[in-house]
Amino acid sequence: PEVNYLQEKITYSSKNIIGFENLFGEALQTQDDIEIFGIMHFPDDYDSSQKYPVIVASHGSLNWRAHHLDYLQQMRQANYIVFAMHPFDSRGVNSTVGNQINVTSESIIYDMATSLNLLWDDPRINNQKIYAAGWSLGGTAALFNAWRPLQEALNLPNASFTGYLMWYPGCL
């Protein structure tokens, strides 16, 4: 579909993580870095002199679908910047339905944490209003990013999501 508002593709570093224990400590450092991306979707009346709240959003196991994009539009229209993570497209995967090893929950959990760190010091962002949102597999990422031990292991000092919105999250 045609887009009539400001967007920005942002690349950043993440990892392909297999095994929840590999999100912590020295095990995390043994995982190779990869480059992934997300798309910033700006409000219609975006003003670069203001700081905006942001929603970091992640899709479910069938990638971004039309109903997800409808929600992203509503968020934008409510004057939020939406950072739509692209964990599948970044890794050349279309779906994990039937094969959850292509892109693991742990990888998307890590992608979301690194998204927070990426946006924390962005001058366009009000870092006291960064929210995590996700559907299914993406909801699992939001759920685990609310867990204090994970925050202490992965987030920048004092960085945290302000709130969490999950549609039918799974579990590990």
Spans of features found by a protein language model:
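Serine-hydrolase catalytic machinery in alpha/beta-hydrolase-like enzymes
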Residues: 26-36, 50-121
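N-terminal cap/lid segment of alpha/beta-hydrolase-fold proteins
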Residues: 2-50
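Extracellular/periplasmic catalytic domains that process cell-envelope and extracellular macromolecules
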Residues: 3, 49-50, 75-77, 125, ...
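Primarily recognizes the serine-hydrolase "nucleophile elbow" in alpha/beta-hydrolase
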Residues: 106, 112-172
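Surface-exposed, flexible loop/turn segments at secondary-structure boundaries
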Residues: 17-18, 46, 63, 90, ...
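Short hydrophobic segments within beta-strands
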Residues: 41, 57-58, 133, 167
